[in-house]
Amino acid sequence: MTKKKITKIVGYINDDIIDKYNLYEYKNRPIVQSLDLYVHIEKHIKDFKSVDSFNYTISNINEIIREPMFVYYEKDRKSLLYYKKLLDNVCVVVKLKLRENKDSYIASVYPVSEYKIQKMIEKSYLKD
């Protein structure tokens, strides 16, 4: 008997991001979070200011996806990096998948500095 992966839908790529990065094929496709996420972010837990900050960030992934401060597209990695200020400045990495039965998913979550966010914003202007 194969185990079914436990997931929940945490959001969708908004139209502004779809238009900015020409990601029309991802329109109306869900972004999911699975229990596997905790394995991937274990190494980042100690980077958060506090346990409360980590828990708050994980509990608000859907808000980060829905109302990011800034989003950067890494075309070569097929990833969207969602940045938002919560208790920490955080980055939520969404891996984009198009194959049938494969959802785009939360690949990582970690705190970042204000400096890092500004550098990514500058980098995005250079790409445009």
Which sequence ranges carry the predicted segments?
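Ribonuclease/tRNase effector modules and their secretory precursors
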Residues: 1-128
